[in-house]
Amino acid sequence: MEELQEPLRGQLRLCFTQAARTSLLLLRLNDAALRALQECQRQQVRPVIAFQGHRGYLRLPGPGWSCLFSFIVSQCCQEGAGGSLDLVCQRFLRSGPNSLHCLGSLRERLIIWAAMDSIPAPSSVQGHNLTEDARHPESWQNTGGYSEGDAVSQPQMALEEVSVSDPLASNQGQSLPGSSREHMAQWEVRSQTHVPNREPVQALPSSASRKRLDKKRSVPVATVELEEKRFRTLPLVPSPLQGLTNQDLQEGEDWEQEDEDMDPRLEHSSSVQEDSESPSPEDIPDYLLQYRAIHSAEQQHAYEQDFETDYAEYRILHARVGTASQRFIELGAEIKRVRRGTPEYKVLEDKIIQEYKKFRKQYPSYREEKRRCEYLHQKLSHIKGLILEFEEKNRGS
């Protein structure tokens, strides 16, 4: 994806007419964000927007409530060599023929999604729950839920970007204008041709797909069975906790303290290695005592069965812990790029605190599952190494 030529700065405002110093964006948002914008329009309050590169946050304040949303700005995909995406409006006139007006080309796309619960919404919209889509960790990374194929079904509006010195222009803007749907209609006009044979992005083959591919190849049956066995029992994905440091989690002292107290298994510094004293039995992981070198095919089969049992649990924990860890790593990296004391820093700080509080309530067993996931990763790696070592010896003999 191409980089935007220059960063967007200024005040975000809904508009349906051309004006000087404006940029047209394709706005895509879910139902929760749309309801929040409508409530903000009804309350006649000024939204606050903070850009950080091509990402940012949108705060919709109100009397006694506040909503915080995340957004990302990207290039609009153009179909064909000369394809373009234009914003066209139709004016319905009482007298005379209706007219079409091209407001301009849509080069950037701004995707907004509900990122968290903030302060409870006013009673007029409590029944709709402004951030209903953000109650589960699976919805935190929601950008992938929008694609070019569903562009027509998503609400689309023209956005006016007024150049000002402060990216958080909360005092120089105007309130959201009234709804213009009864006066205008908008369409996406895709010029040039449509690519009919576009292939979807292919993911890495799974174990089942590899089995099917192996069966189709003209290889000996023994080789096929060996490959099926290998993919079924020995595919170990990397741990999601590798490279995770306490500095990546900017908020949550309890979380950080818990990480500091974790036992760094199988990691020995030079000072420890130089120590002549041997480690006590309680310091040695149980799987090192239980799983020794393999000397028979029966022992190998037993190890593989244990591997399959623990691997099923590891896959579940890996998905849960990895999603949660990655979210706070990204937030920590974003706040590091902002200078402390600025409005952007305050917006990010509030977002991290609120998301962490909500995360602790929704996922109280995170620490235990994180430890268990790390333990299983080390255990499965150990068993896998023993099996490969035994097979290598047999292959050589």
UniProtKB/Swiss-Prot annotation:
The keyword Transport does not apply. One of its GO terms (molecular function) is cis-regulatory region sequence-specific DNA binding. Keywords: Nucleus, Transcription, Transcription regulation. GO terms for cellular component: cell junction; chromosome; cytosol; nuclear speck; nucleolus; nucleoplasm; nucleus; transcription elongation factor complex. It is found in: Nucleus. One of its GO terms (biological process) is DNA-templated transcription elongation. Residues 168-178 have a biased composition (Polar residues). Gene3D superfamilies: 6.10.140.340. Residues 250-262 have a biased composition (Acidic residues). Residues 164-219, 237-284 are annotated as: Disordered. InterPro entries: ELL/occludin, ELL_N, Occludin_ELL. Residues 269-281 have a biased composition (Low complexity). It comes from the Eukaryota. Testis specific. It holds the Pfam family ELL. Residues 285-395 form the OCEL domain. Interacts with AFF4. Component of the super elongation complex (SEC), at least composed of EAF1, EAF2, CDK9, MLLT3/AF9, AFF (AFF1 or AFF4), the P-TEFb complex and ELL (ELL, ELL2 or ELL3). Component of the little elongation complex (LEC), at least composed of ELL (ELL, ELL2 or ELL3), ZC3H8, ICE1 and ICE2. Belongs to the ELL/occludin family. This is RNA polymerase II elongation factor ELL3. The gene is ELL3.
